[in-house]
Amino acid sequence: MKIAIPITDENFDEVLLKARNADILEFRVDSFTNKDISFVSGLLKKAKENGFETILTIRSEKEGGAYVENRVEMFEKLMPLSDYTDIELSSTDIIAYISRLSKEYNKKLIVSYHNFEMTPANFVIKETIREALRYGDIPKIALKANSYEDVARLMCSAIDIKTPKILISMGEFGKISRIAGFIFGSFISYAYLEKPNAPGQLSLEEMLKLKEMFYLR
């Protein structure tokens, strides 16, 4: 079980201290104030020096991110410095290229899919996971849960996928998935330090308490 904290470049040294009990820092580069490649490179190296794994994420506008003009160049230059890279399944114009890059650099590629409105039918979830695995190593499926049944359907739809995966039910109903997902093979859960980055996200403090309560390793 690994806990990831999405971060920007704001108060970076303070974040390193506050996040010391987390495992991974997700660099949301699309939300950085300073997107200079050499600057971001320096922060990635500093995170590694402080014992964190890192996820490079440059989220697209259509999945909740901000526009980045030189997005592909940033992937090219920064991927070698990060343990994982996250690319949206919906980024159809560049996903095949990013997939090839990840293989060249021998880096793990997270292929993510977000639905902020609903949890689709089970066969749609399974097909989305299969499509994600065409390009990457780790499917990340984040769906809005409008009932506890939606949470259960997501978890059960992916239970036969034996490769590493990330399963998230968003919203109030989905809060339980942030910790229960580990039981169904989800190996990363995202938490926050100051304010949630996604609906239903738990704080790092809450996640650590739940991890201890349920003896999750």
UniProtKB/Swiss-Prot annotation:
It comes from the Bacteria. GO terms for molecular function: 3-dehydroquinate dehydratase activity. 3-dehydroquinate binds at residues 26-28, 59, 178, 201. Keywords: Amino-acid biosynthesis, Aromatic amino acid biosynthesis, Lyase, Schiff base. NCBIfam families: aroD (TIGR01093). Involved in the third step of the chorismate pathway, which leads to the biosynthesis of aromatic amino acids. Catalyzes the cis-dehydration of 3-dehydroquinate (DHQ) and introduces the first double bond of the aromatic ring to yield 3-dehydroshikimate. This is 3-dehydroquinate dehydratase. It comes from Hydrogenobaculum sp. (strain Y04AAS1).
